Every structure is written in C-alpha cells, then in structure tokens.
Design a protein with these regions (language model features):
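N-terminal beta1-alpha1 ligand-phosphate binding loop
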Residues: 2-28
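FMN-binding flavodoxin-like domain, especially the glycine-rich phosphate-binding loop
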Residues: 16, 24-34, 46-160
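Short acidic active-site motifs
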Residues: 38-43
C-alpha cells in the first residue's frame, strides 16, 4: 500500500499532526510524510491512499495546498482513497469572538474544501474531513490532539 501524507504548516502544528498520522500508518508499507513544497502532482499517481492536511488560514487551506490540489488533473486521483484534515481553533474559542464565529459559519474550515477538491479529482473519500485543535494562532496543539490524530489514522486504515 503506497501512502502519502501531504501537508503544509505555518507554525509547525499541522506538521506535528501529519507526522502523528504518518507514524500511526507506519506499520503499512511505503508511508511517506511529505511537505507540500516537495510535491509535484505527477508524484500522486499510483498511490493507494493520499491524506492531505493544512492549517486553516482565513477559513481555507494554505495557498500551497490549494495550488497543488488545483494542479492535479481531472480524474488524476481515480482509484486513490483520500482523506483530509486541518488544524483550527476550538468552537469555544471561536465563539468568544462574534465576528469570527459568523465567518466560520459561512466559510468553515480548511478540511472540507480540501476533501471536496480531492473527490473532484477522482479520489474516494474514506472518512469525513477532520479538524485538530490548537490553543492559539501559533499553537500549541491542545493536549491529546496527537493521540487523536493517531486514532484518526487508524480509522483511515480500517477503511482499506
């Protein structure tokens, strides 16, 4: 099973989650954890599983993740199982700032549009998009999030 976990990270939090996911998949053969800046769309062909992660920046994925996903040819992920995750604030933190809560209700987080784009490119979504929580803009990850990421990865494996 050839699996890639592709991520972007601004302050390191999404990278930590990506590594926790990749390490949980580690008993699987051929697991690669790759920063988006090191990925070309043609490298994604022939994968069994592709997991993509991004911090939520202005209610969407980073520009680098968006560019990569847009550059994948139509049906370029046909036959590939896919999943998406993001890092974000907790709902209780968002609710403290009324305007932020309003925008989140309208625009959401990064994981859903990534999952939608992966499906548009022919991928088969194996689990709903997932969010992992940070305590502030620069982090840190909240306690237990790395373990939750590893558990989520095990759920992904169970779909194979």
């Amino acid at each position: 099973m050839k699996t890639w976990v592709v991520y972007d990270s601004v302050f390191g939090n999404t990278g930590q989650i990506a590594r926790a996911i990749g390490n949980a998949l580690g008993s699987q053969e051929d697991v690669e954890i790759v920063r988006v800046s090191d990925v070309k769309p043609e490298q994604l062909t022939g994968l069994t599983l592709l997991i993509v992660g991004s911090p939520t920046r202005q209610f969407r994925p980073t520009g680098a993740i968006t560019s990569l996903l847009k550059s994948i040819p139509k049906d370029g992920l046909r036959g590939v199982k896919v999943a998406a995750f993001d890092t974000r604030f907790t709902v209780s933190e968002i609710e403290k700032v009324r305007i932020l809560a309003f925008f989140v209700r309208i625009f959401g987080y990064a994981a859903k549009p990534m999952a939608d784009r992966l499906e548009k490119k022919g991928g088969e979504l194996v689990l709903p998009p997932e969010g992992f929580y940070v305590g502030d803009t620069e982090g840190p990850l909240l306690e237990g999030e790395l373990e939750r990421a590893a558990d989520w990865a095990k759920q992904v494996i169970a779909t194979q």
